[in-house]
Amino acid sequence: MTGRVETADGKVYELPALLEWRLRRTGGVPCDSFRARCLYSAEMGEALKAACRFAATENGVTRFRGVIDEWSAVCGAEGAVLTVEGRGMAALLLDNEAEAVTYQRAALSEILKDHAAACGVAWEPRGEVYGTGEYAVASGSSRWKAIEGFARRCGLTPYFTREGVLCLRGAAEGRRLVLEEPEGVIEAWY
């Protein structure tokens, strides 16, 4: 597993070999989370001050992309170790409040533009979907709640991919997973 941090101005910095990592995927709420540890050197300090995103890749495939909540560098028995922690991209929608608004026959693209794009969240393109009647977003609601509420009215379920992209799927687009007493599995969820 390889870790990298990204700054708001688009610069990407590769982290040294990860000593430890934990990736927790939920796809929605509560949002995904991560923790990564690697050796720290003083040259990393400036990049880390501006770091806002983290990505973990394996064999060129993104396994996780999220928001950095905190980082710390500690000098101890293991040497100087950097710990980077945070949450999935859903955190941007959960942490930001929507303004009160009432839509008249809103389109999904309008809801996504108002609530996802405003937070810098990318979404998977799909055909246009229109709500029926009025759709109101209460003052103080999270942007996630604004999107999720509209999506569910339209028969869609919002979730985030491991690449940090917001997707909306209908019930017919899901997939069924069956576990028939697999040997050695103690716990499983999807």
Language-model regions, residue ranges each:
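Surface-exposed cap/loop segments at beta↔alpha junctions
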Residues: 39-122
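Hydrophobic beta-strand residues in large extracellular and virion-surface proteins
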Residues: 3-5, 34-36, 54-56, 68, ...
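A short, compositionally biased
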Residues: 1-2, 47-52, 152-154
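Juxtamembrane "anchor/assembly" segments of surface/extracellular structural proteins
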Residues: 1-47, 88-91
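Short, ordered beta-strand-loop transition motifs
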Residues: 23-32, 73-80, 160-163
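Short beta-strand-centered interaction patches in the first periplasmic/extracellular domains
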Residues: 79-81, 85-91, 125-190
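Short amphipathic beta-strand/extended segments with alternating polar/hydrophobic composition
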Residues: 12-18, 64-69, 97, 104, ...
